[in-house]
């Protein structure tokens, strides 16, 4: 609301400024107050076609159009300084009012049209080979800018354009963890489309360009929480399908301790205080309760595979995902953790890296011929070529319901990452009956993601001051899991991905380093390959 009010006030002041200035260009003052007509007259005054004003209605490009109208407009009154151009875009009344009240300031004609005519004449003379006339035109250039100003304007435009593209259209991401290993590897750099699933407009508007949520080296957040905008998403070009890799904001990342190694939620530390004891830097933050509270679009970015869609019932039985009672489709390079025992200790590990088995994927098993390794089926087959008698067995996973969503050992204490669920994924418009058991499952969803006032009254849930026996969900949710199933912190750990947290769809890998290090080489075979069809 605050931001909209600022825009509204600024537009009203702009209209007043045009009302005061229009008589100087021979236009009735009242036209400056009429939306649409005022910009049509500005276009005429600078020599732009009138239809340019219509482009102000087109999202994304309208800011460039606005700047392309207002900057030449004030220049047509001889206001050539950089600060005057800046004011014409950011706070136009700050330059329009002085223009209107200075009798010495006159309209010099259609600035844009005259500038284009000059450039056309200059190009014509250059092609003719008349150096004398060309030098004369250059020396008498009425639109000359200093080298410093040219650089400043170029840098400002480049930064703004890059930030604009990153904010609305496409963003580059680097895979930092092995949770999608085999499909998307540590060191993969990829572009993510922000329009395929519907472009989400920024909610946090005051931010440092080209930074997501932290200022490198300073350890501070790169944005201000206020002013902000409400959630809005443009229509999607395609829906999110099961097994699509998706990029999203970490749903539980609204209150986080940020250590040098990673971010930890306040809830994670409360459930397992030993985490802070193992990390000295984190321990200091926890002791001071120095955690960051982040809005939706400034939570950390995660990339996982959408394995469950809205309305699905999902369950993991002996590592296999089941959707609505049927086995789900498995990714080609699905990985698990295995106990690997070779029949001999003289095993050649030289090719392991070429097979996609990174150093970080391998742990010692306590004996010279024993390893604990994250592997997919293809890698298992290659290990067997080294030793036909090798033993490769699934490594059992611990039972700790407190570490797994919904963190309730009373009802869900026997779950593991390999035997999990069933869980019903909320769907927009669907209504559920609230029970003591599923309240634990959907409490955060109803309270935080759906923005309700929620409390417990015995075994009942009180929503917005009223005891509720049922609840109807306001948006869709998804279930996301990493392909590296035993090395992925995903929906099994923190639950549902709300639709308003969806950032975009991975498109293609534009660069890839081996195991995330340039010193280990470049994965040339991964560059310019699809990031979604894996």
Model-derived features: positions:
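N-terminal intrinsically disordered, acidic low-complexity segments at the extreme N-terminus
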Residues: 92-132
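Feature marks short, highly hydrophobic, charge-poor N-terminal signal-anchor/signal peptide-like helices
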Residues: 1-6
């Amino acid at each position: 609301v605050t931001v909209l009010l600022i825009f509204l006030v600024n537009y009203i002041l702009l209209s007043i400024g045009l009302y005061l200035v229009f008589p100087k260009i021979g236009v009735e003052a009242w036209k400056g107050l009429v939306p649409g007509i005022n910009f049509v007259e500005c276009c005429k005054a600078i020599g732009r076609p009138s239809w340019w004003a219509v482009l102000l209605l087109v999202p994304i490009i309208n800011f460039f159009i606005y700047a392309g109208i207002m900057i030449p407009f004030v220049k047509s009154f001889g206001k050539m300084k950089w600060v005057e151009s800046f004011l014409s875009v950011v706070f136009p009344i700050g330059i329009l009012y002085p223009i209107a009240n200075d009798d010495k300031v006159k309209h010099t004609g259609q600035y844009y049209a005259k500038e284009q005519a000059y450039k056309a004449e200059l190009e014509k003379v250059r092609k003719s080979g008349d150096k004398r006339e060309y030098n004369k035109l250059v020396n008498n250039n009425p639109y000359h800018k200093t080298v410093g100003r040219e650089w400043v304007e170029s840098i400002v435009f480049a930064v703004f354009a890059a930030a604009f593209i990153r904010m609305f259209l496409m963003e580059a991401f680097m895979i930092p963890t092995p949770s999608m290993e085999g499909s998307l590897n540590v060191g993969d750099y990829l572009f993510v489309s922000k329009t395929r699933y519907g472009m989400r407009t920024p909610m946090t508007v005051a931010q440092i360009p080209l930074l997501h949520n932290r200022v490198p080296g300073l350890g501070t957040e790169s944005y201000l929480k206020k002013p902000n905008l409400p959630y809005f998403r443009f229509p999607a070009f395609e829906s999110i399908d099961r097994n699509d890799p998706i990029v999203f904001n970490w749903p539980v990342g609204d209150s986080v301790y940020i250590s040098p190694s990673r971010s930890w939620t306040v809830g994670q530390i409360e459930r397992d205080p030993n985490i802070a004891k193992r990390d000295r830097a984190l321990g200091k933050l926890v002791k001071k309760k120095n955690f960051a509270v982040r809005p939706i679009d400034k939570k950390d970015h995660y990339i996982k595979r959408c394995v469950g869609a809205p309305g699905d019932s999902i369950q993991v039985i002996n590592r296999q995902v089941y959707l609505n009672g049927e086995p789900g489709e498995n990714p080609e390079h699905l990985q698990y953790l295995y106990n690997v025992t070779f029949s001999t200790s003289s095993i050649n590990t030289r090719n392991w890296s070429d097979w996609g088995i990174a150093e970080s994927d391998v742990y010692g098993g306590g004996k010279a011929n024993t390893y604990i390794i994250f592997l997919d089926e293809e890698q298992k087959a290659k290990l067997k070529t080294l030793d036909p008698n090798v033993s490769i067995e699934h490594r059992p996973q611990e039972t700790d319901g407190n570490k797994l969503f919904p963190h309730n050992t009373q009802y869900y204490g026997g779950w593991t990452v390999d035997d999990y669920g069933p869980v019903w994924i909320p769907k927009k418009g669907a209504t559920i009956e609230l029970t003591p058991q599923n309240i634990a499952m959907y409490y955060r969803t109803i309270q935080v993601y759906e923005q309700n006032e929620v409390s417990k009254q015995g075994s009942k849930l009180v929503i917005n001051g009223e005891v509720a026996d049922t609840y109807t969900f306001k948006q869709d949710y998804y279930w996301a899991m990493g392909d590296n199933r035993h090395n992925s912190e995903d929906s099994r750990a923190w639950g549902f991905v709300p639709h308003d947290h969806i950032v975009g769809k991975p498109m293609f890998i534009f660069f890839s380093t081996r195991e995330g290090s340039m010193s280990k080489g470049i994965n040339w075979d991964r560059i310019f390959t699809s990031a979604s069809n894996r």
